[in-house]
Amino acid sequence: MDIAKRQRLEAAGWTIGTVEEFLGLSSEEIAFIEMKLALSKAIKQNRISQQMTQHELAQKIKSSQSRVAKMEAGDPSTSLDLLIRTLLIFGATRQDIAEVILNSGS
C-alpha cells in the first residue's frame, strides 16, 4: 500500500496491519500455511505442465476432482500427506519437495 493511502486511512481512524496480526497467527502457523500453499502451487504447475485435467489427476491419485481443486486452491482441509503424495505421484523426488518447501517463504 502506498504511503499516501495508508496515511489517509489512518487519519480516518483505520488501523493498518498485516494478515498475521489480524488473524493472530504465530510465526509457526504462518510458515506452515506458506509451505502448504507452495506445495499446492507445485501440484497445479505439475498438472498443467503435463497437460492433465483435474479429473485426470484425481483418477491418478484415487481421489475426486473437487479434492484436486481444493488442493490447488490451498484449502486448509487438504492434508499435508495428500499434497506430498500427489507430488511423489508426479515423479517429484524428496529433493524436489524439499526445494518447494525451502522456497515457500520467499
Question: Where in this protein do the model-derived segments appear?
Answer:
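Residue-level detection of the helix-turn-helix DNA-binding "recognition helix"
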Residues: I48, K62, A73-D75, L102
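N-terminal flexible/basic segments that precede or flank functional cores
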Residues: M1-A38, A98-S106
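Alpha-helical DNA-recognition elements
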Residues: K70, G74, R85
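Short basic helix-loop element that most often maps to the first helix and adjoining turn
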Residues: A12, K41-E56, R85
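Alpha-helix N-cap/N′ positions at the starts of helices
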Residues: A38-L39, S63
